[in-house]
Amino acid sequence: MLERFRQGWQKVMRPLASGLLAMHVTPDMVTWIGTIGAVVMALVCLPQGWLWQGALLITLFIFSDSLDGNMARQLGRTSQWGSFLDSTLDRFGDGAVFAGIALYYAGPGHSTLWCGVALAALILSLVTSYVRAKAESLSMDAKMGIATRADRLLISLVAVEITGLARVGVLAHWLCWALPVGLCYLTVAGAITVGQRMTAVKRQSES
């Protein structure tokens, strides 16, 4: 759903990438800083119930996902190592967001049910990424699906932000349901995406 906007977003980020390169910041540095920042914010802010603050800070660090590749292309240094590092660290960031949400519901959110749903969304997000990686290692394509990484991040972080603002009275209280609804969608969409990718790989393997 959101992958179609990636090219336009890259153009927006190009000036910032150029500025960082002028300061002698490397793409790998941006990748590491972005991942560490996102993981720390997710595992510190969300379990404490600092939802809107955490979502905002995590989003800022996740911007590095667009920056590092943009910087590498401007340097003409795109490499297998850079792609591998970026994909590997992305999994840490994705996992930390859902783990932070699960810890929130295990603590101040007081809901075993939604903690479990958050863990299910976490597992499915990791399996979705694994299916694609394994398919590509077998020279097959499995990029399709209704819940790509960009979709998962946008929906989860927007849902956390809305719920956080509703909890502090900035938005209507009924919007506290934004996060549970978002988790339900991501769990169902994740399961469908895994099924779509497995089906695609099966068809390719039999053709």
Which residues make up each language-model segment?
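Hydrophobic alpha-helical segments and helix-packing faces
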Residues: 60, 77, 81, 85, ...
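Hydrophobic alpha-helical transmembrane segments
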Residues: 1-59, 97-207
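Active-site His/Glu-centered metal-binding helix of metallohydrolases
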Residues: 63-71, 84, 88-92, 96, ...
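Hydrophobic/aromatic-rich structural module bridging two neighboring secondary-structure elements via a short loop
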Residues: 50-77
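Juxtamembrane helix-capping/reentrant segments at transmembrane boundaries
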Residues: 10, 14, 68-90, 141-147
